[in-house]
Regions:
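A conserved acidic beta->alpha catalytic loop
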Residues: 29, 58-67, 114
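Acceptor/aglycone-binding surface of glycosyltransferases and processive sugar-polymer synthases
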Residues: 87-101, 118-192, 196, 224-233
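Conserved donor nucleotide-binding strand/loop of the catalytic core
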Residues: 67-101
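Short, well-formed alpha-helical segments that are part of the catalytic scaffolds
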Residues: 4-7, 28-45
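Short aromatic/hydrophobic "clamp" motif used to bind/position activated sugar donors
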Residues: 107
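Short beta-strand/loop segment that forms part of the nucleotide-sugar
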Residues: 50-61, 83-85
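Hydrophobic helical membrane-anchoring modules
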Residues: 1-19, 30-31, 167, 191-243
Length: 243
């Protein structure tokens, strides 16, 4: 009986088991590489026994993603993989390009500026260790209080449509932080949407498999994070792609 099953905990196969973190990047702000270096230190301090590897994907940036910044990053974090796409395709395409370079048992993706607290990232990894195939960030009121009206409406509309049209029980698919094991990674790699709603396609595909364990985890936004507004028409266009 599937309902009575529980995930099988993930056991470290070796010391310093690697976790890949895919970081899509578009027009990053000045100093982005230094922040990544600092976040890497925080993660390794909190995740004893893991080797953290960043996979940074440039999604056709017109500014910010400079040779100097990349060199500074890779000099400090030599294991970092840089995927330098010259054409902007969208976050979904960028994440898939990054995942293609990942060979770790556990992995996750989030925005390059790490909008959520490191403790929230560690919580995602905790549930992957517990055996869940996909772990989804569930945003709380602190997140929505920092959204523009347009983006807030789009987020609530997305959750409503996820439930009504797609039958998803995990409706907060747009959190921008998700973890997965190899099984979950295969669902992500099979998505096709290039932009806003690739997260929804990912969770929808994973939810169709009754043997896949999905877990929602409450996450906290960093207080200093400023969330950008959404361009007009993006949500509607991506909804058409999904449907």
């Amino acid at each position: 009986d599937y309902a009575s099953r529980t995930p099988t905990p993930f056991l470290h196969k070796k010391d310093n088991e690697r976790i890949d973190i895919v970081l899509p990047c578009y027009n990053p702000y000045e100093g982005w590489e230094q922040q990544l270096i600092e976040k890497h230190k925080e993660l390794e301090a909190m995740l004893d026994g893991y080797d953290i590897r960043f996979i940074v994907v440039n999604d056709g940036s017109k500014r910010g993603f400079t040779e100097e910044a990349v060199l500074r990053l890779t000099n400090n974090l030599p294991s970092t993989i840089i995927v330098d796409n010259k054409t902007n395709q969208g976050k979904g395409a960028a994440v898939r390009d990054g995942i293609a370079y990942s060979d770790s048992e556990l992995a996750l993706y989030t925005d390059y500026d790490f909008p959520y607290k490191i403790e929230s990232v560690c919580q995602v990894i905790k549930y992957l260790e517990a055996g869940y195939d996909v772990v989804v960030a569930n945003r709380n009121h602190t997140y929505y209080s920092q959204l523009s009206t347009r983006r807030k409406l789009a987020s609530h509309a997305s959750r409503f449509l996820n439930f009504m049209l797609l039958g998803l029980t995990h409706t907060d698919t747009q959190g921008g932080l998700k973890g997965f094991n190899r099984k979950g990674k295969a669902f992500l790699a099979s998505t096709r949407i290039k932009q806003f709603l690739f997260d929804t396609e990912f969770i929808y595909k994973a939810s169709l498999d009754d043997t896949t364990f999905i877990k929602e985890v409450p996450v906290d936004l960093r207080s200093e994070v400023m969330l950008p507004d959404m361009k007009k028409g993006v949500f509607v266009n991506e909804l058409k792609n999904l449907l």
